[in-house]
Swiss-Prot record:
Keyword Nucleus attached: yes
Gene3D superfamilies named in the record: 3.30.70.330
Chain ranges of the RRM domain: 191-303, 311-421
Region annotation (Disordered) ranges: 1-29, 41-185, 472-520
Name of the molecule in the record: Nucleolar protein 12
InterPro entries found in the cross-reference section: Nucleotide-bd_a/b_plait_sf (IPR012677), RBD_domain_sf (IPR035979), RRM_dom (IPR000504)
Keywords: Nucleus, Repeat, Ribosome biogenesis, RNA-binding, rRNA processing
Function statement: Involved in pre-25S rRNA processing.
Gene Ontology MF: a single term: RNA binding
Biased composition (Acidic residues): 78-95, 144-168
Source organism of the structure: Emericella nidulans (strain FGSC A4 / ATCC 38163 / CBS 112.46 / NRRL 194 / M139) (Aspergillus nidulans)
Length: 520
């Protein structure tokens, strides 16, 4: 069976060789055609796309090659060739393969390379802050150059190129500032003057305010220029009657110019000059002058004029409101009459009827000041006032105006009497007050407020031992001896000679230790 099967297998082979003539050994082969099949390109390689995070494959180092050769010494050469063909020949080939694969399109908004919104926004803020700092430095340097009298230059810049103001004050709360704010207010009060009977037109009209400011600075040209530039720094209005009646803040009513002229057409103001000398000269130069059709009362805030009751008169039965046009229910409507003006009426009336002695400044009359007492919040008058003259003799002429009317400014009958002296409470002090302390008595509360007034009073009550150390000693002498005499106890020299105890002791000894009567 074996031989038969072998012969059967060899038979088809010979048949196939006979059927294909080019497989026979005797057939000639074309060398050009055979050369095409000698070399083979091998199987088709599928390009591998490496991951983005993975590093490209590099050539195997010599150490790795030695390890692989030692471990795979018995492997076939075909497997080694296959391993080397799988690895990329160079990193450039891997990069080309990555670039060849197209990336899927992104749906995100296209931005420029390296664009970061947060960083750009922060850079913009930093640039704006630098511009503001440069602007502040320029303004600060210009103000320092204008105000500096000695011509001192601005402090040199630091290494970083930023100028540092060492003298800049750190802002503090007013409660922590304490005495520093008090000193500033006191220095400011020396440059401030009080203005009374100012027309309310200065609040509502810019031209009227400009006229008032021009009048207040009219005397500044007479002051010496060596003492500094004299001008008005600021002016503020106080004690103004507003139409709101206290329902809205005073600042809001002032901004809206809701002035209630029916109560009173006058107000008070405070003008701050640039120098203390200008503030001292202002009362003598401006008091009693007429501006905006009203007599102006000017007084120094730091050193007000003395109130002398011997030169004052008390005026009663005055109008509470200047324009009393309103009527109650059931009353007949009064005839239309011009509105009264209490404060200006007192100035004009008493100046016109006191011509006996012209003791005041030329052309200003004899009235020094008029003080109408009003409510603090509503500015409604309380029906009385005080008029002070320059000369005491004017009081006698003013008393003749009792029970008289002077319409339209003073439509009611006046009650004119001598002013009485008001006894003031004495300030409790440990010793005689100094001149500097007397200047603040009675004015500390008005200038600095209640808290600062209490602080000053507490400081005045302190003894010397609480405020400072006291060193006591002796005054030096030429011979170096001390002038202080110390009394020492002397037993024999200053003892009494014929004393009663001495006589009793002598009698006791003479009696032999027994009691005996002492001879007289």
């Amino acid at each position: 069976m074996g031989k038969k099967s072998k012969s059967q297998k060899e038979a088809p082979a010979t048949e196939s060789a006979g059927s294909l003539p080019f497989l026979g050994g005797n057939v000639s082969v074309d060398p050009s055609l055979a050369s095409l099949f000698e070399q083979s390109a091998g199987p088709v390689k599928v390009p591998e796309v490496p991951r983005l995070g993975a590093a490209p494959k590099t050539k195997i180092t010599d150490v790795e090659k030695d390890e692989e050769e030692s471990s795979s010494a018995g492997n076939d050469s075909a497997s080694e060739d296959q391993f080397m063909e799988d690895a990329p020949e160079s990193p450039d080939a891997a990069e080309e393969a990555v670039q060849a694969v197209p990336e899927p399109p992104s749906r995100k908004r296209k931005r420029a390379a390296g664009e970061d919104l947060e960083e750009s926004y922060m850079r913009r803020l930093a640039k704006e802050e630098q511009k503001e700092q440069k602007k502040r430095r320029a303004e600060r340097s210009s103000s320092l150059e204008e105000e500096s009298e000695d011509g001192e230059k601005e402090s040199p810049q630091s290494e970083d190129g930023e100028s540092e103001d060492e003298g800049a004050d750190i802002p503090k709360h007013e409660a922590l500032a304490g005495a520093a704010n008090d000193d500033d207010e006191l220095s400011k009060s020396n440059r401030t003057v009080f203005l009374g009977n100012v027309s309310t037109k200065a609040i509502t009209s810019k031209s009227a305010k400009k006229e008032l400011m021009k009048h207040l600075s009219s005397f500044l040209s007479t002051l010496p220029e060596s003492t500094g530039p004299h001008k008005i720094d600021s002016i503020r209005f106080r004690s103004t009657a507003f139409a709101s009646g206290g329902k809205i803040p005073k600042r809001a009513a002032f901004a809206k110019q809701e002035i209630h002229d029916d109560t009173t057409p006058s107000t008070n103001a405070y003008a701050v000059y640039s120098t203390a000398q200008a503030a001292k000269k202002a009362p003598a130069a401006l008091n009693g002058t007429v501006v905006l059709d009203r007599h102006l009362r000017v007084d120094n805030v730091a050193h007000p004029a003395k109130v002398d009751h011997k030169r004052c008169v008390f005026v009663g039965n005055l109008d509470f409101i200047d324009n009393e046009t309103g009527t109650e229910e059931g009353e007949k409507k009064k005839k239309n009459r011009p509105p009264a003006d209490v404060e200006e009426g007192l100035w004009r009336t008493f100046n016109a009827h006191t011509k006996a002695s012209q003791s005041g400044p030329a052309g200003r009359g004899n009235v020094e000041s008029v003080r109408v007492v009003r409510d603090r919040s509503t500015r409604v008058g309380k029906g009385f006032a005080y008029v002070q003259f320059y000369d005491q003799n004017c009081v006698e002429e003013a008393l003749l105006l009792n029970d008289k009317r002077f319409p339209p400014l003073l439509p009611r009958k006046l009650r004119v009497v001598r002013a009485k002296k008001v006894a003031k409470k004495s300030v409790e002090t440990t010793g005689a007050p100094k001149g500097s302390d007397r200047t603040l008595q009675g004015r500390a509360g008005k200038l600095l407020g209640r808290s600062s007034e209490a602080r000053l009073k507490a400081a005045a009550k302190k003894s010397i031992s609480q405020s400072s150390l006291v060193f006591e000693g002796n005054r030096a002498t030429a011979d170096g001896s001390s002038r202080i005499r110390v009394r020492t106890k002397s037993r024999g020299s200053k003892a009494k000679k014929d004393s009663r105890s001495k006589k009793r002791a002598a009698a006791y000894k003479a009696a032999g230790g027994k009691k005996a009567k002492i001879g007289k």
